[in-house]
């Protein structure tokens, strides 16, 4: 079914209008006890595998570089993957660190890669609050954005980070549009 949708619609449309709403609904149904944790994990892992297939090669992009990570104890990464796929389709190079990433690992990646953007994601506010000092320190050294239901405007303002829109496709499109691009000129370089 997903393959037929991918053949008929743009990936961004499928992510925004089908997969993200489905995942929200699945999470709500799990919270109400209508689906088991096994069913939720099965559906999420099936979608994760398919999305990561779409992300194949995203580490070799030639545009700006983004490091994407879920905060420590955060396992829900599908929105972050959708965000990364959208950036990748806009020419970005994606370094995906995954769920439950230690802050020290995120900091080390930011220092060694020197990305144009670091994105931290979380579905609940506690990991953001627990690591707010490290987040503020990271924001002083790189362009940092916070995403997911756990990220708040107050935290973004206090730490110096940007707050992403809740829709990962719109968030990626907004970040891409906000990033400066190198200016190319057609002027000659001078005598050979």
What is the predicted function of each stretch?
Residues 1-57:
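Long amphipathic alpha-helical segments
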Residues 150-192:
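Peripheral docking tails and interdomain loops at the edges
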